[in-house]
């Protein structure tokens, strides 16, 4: 199993990150919070990972913090929650927000996450409430991302729409969310603001 990767950040195209580790490129899927925290292309980075093995593929999922990776591992234990949906949940809200909603049993708020219907939200609350006891309000990482002015705002917005679609949003909804964000922001900032527009 691969527990972490340490190398040069080669590319960022949500939801995927490409890391060069001694000449080998590892493709890693990650929640948006990790994109905000990881740095810029060319930086030396370290990602905690979880290897997910299926019949048809071996996938790597990456996380900027142990708290996120731990919640991911708990989420994929829930019946009906796959790795992709778990990444979508972690992209839609912070670990603390999720733990808080589960703790108070706020299933309706969880249905605002793409792909999470009423039954799935209720199952998340029921199955995870006991498992998340003691998580409290763990320190969430303070993410600071550099805002880089894009020379091609249209392409940035198109890439942001694609990223939101890959996180489970419908095309029309993703397009509407991105169009509401001001132009000239980095890809990460555009996605972050689009996700913030969905009030959870």
Curated annotation (Swiss-Prot):
The keyword DNA repair belongs to this UniProt entry's keyword annotation: yes
GO biological process: DNA recombination; DNA repair
GO CC list: cytoplasm; Holliday junction helicase complex; Holliday junction resolvase complex
Region (Flexible linker): 144-154
Entry's Gene Ontology molecular function annotations: ATP binding; four-way junction DNA binding; four-way junction helicase activity
Pfam family of the protein (one): RuvA_C
Domain of life from the UniProt record: Bacteria
Location of the region described as Domain I in the Swiss-Prot/TrEMBL record: 1-64
Keywords: Cytoplasm, DNA damage, DNA recombination, DNA repair, DNA-binding
UniProt keyword Iron present: no
InterPro entries according to UniProt: DNA_helicase_Holl-junc_RuvA_I, Hlx-hairpin-Hlx_DNA-bd_motif, NA-bd_OB-fold, RuvA, RuvA_2-like, RuvA_C, RuvA_C_sf
Region (Domain III): 154-200
Compartments reported by the entry: Cytoplasm
Region Domain II, annotated ranges: 65-143
HAMAP family, A to Z: DNA_HJ_migration_RuvA
Domain description: Has three domains with a flexible linker between the domains II and III and assumes an 'L' shape. Domain III is highly mobile and contacts RuvB.
Family according to the record: Belongs to the RuvA family.
Role played: The RuvA-RuvB-RuvC complex processes Holliday junction (HJ) DNA during genetic recombination and DNA repair, while the RuvA-RuvB complex plays an important role in the rescue of blocked DNA replication forks via replication fork reversal (RFR). RuvA specifically binds to HJ cruciform DNA, conferring on it an open structure. The RuvB hexamer acts as an ATP-dependent pump, pulling dsDNA into and through the RuvAB complex. HJ branch migration allows RuvC to scan DNA until it finds its consensus sequence, where it cleaves and resolves the cruciform DNA.
Subunit structure: Homotetramer. Forms an RuvA(8)-RuvB(12)-Holliday junction (HJ) complex. HJ DNA is sandwiched between 2 RuvA tetramers; dsDNA enters through RuvA and exits via RuvB. An RuvB hexamer assembles on each DNA strand where it exits the tetramer. Each RuvB hexamer is contacted by two RuvA subunits (via domain III) on 2 adjacent RuvB subunits; this complex drives branch migration. In the full resolvosome a probable DNA-RuvA(4)-RuvB(12)-RuvC(2) complex forms which resolves the HJ.
Name of the protein in question: Holliday junction branch migration complex subunit RuvA
Species: Hydrogenovibrio crunogenus (strain DSM 25203 / XCL-2)
């Amino acid at each position: 199993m691969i527990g972490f990767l340490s190398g040069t950040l080669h590319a960022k195209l949500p939801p995927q990150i490409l890391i060069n580790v001694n000449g080998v490129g590892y493709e890693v899927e990650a929640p948006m919070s990790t994109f905000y925290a990881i740095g810029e292309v060319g930086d030396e980075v370290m990602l905690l990972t979880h290897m997910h093995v299926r019949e048809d593929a071996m996938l790597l999922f990456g996380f900027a913090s142990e708290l996120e990776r731990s919640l991911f591992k708990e989420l994929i234990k829930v019946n009906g929650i796959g790795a992709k949906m778990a990444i979508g949940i972690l992209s839609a809200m912070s670990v603390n927000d999720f733990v808080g909603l589960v703790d108070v049993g706020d299933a309706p708020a969880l249905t605002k996450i793409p792909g999470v219907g009423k039954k799935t939200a209720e199952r998340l609350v029921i199955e995870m409430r006991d498992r998340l006891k003691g998580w409290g309000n763990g320190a969430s990482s303070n993410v600071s991302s550099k805002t880089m002015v894009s020379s091609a705002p249209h392409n940035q917005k198109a890439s942001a729409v694609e990223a939101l679609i890959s996180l489970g949003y419908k095309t029309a909804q993703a397009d509407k969310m991105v169009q509401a964000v001001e132009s000239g922001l980095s890809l990460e900032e555009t996605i972050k603001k689009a996700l913030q527009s969905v009030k959870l």
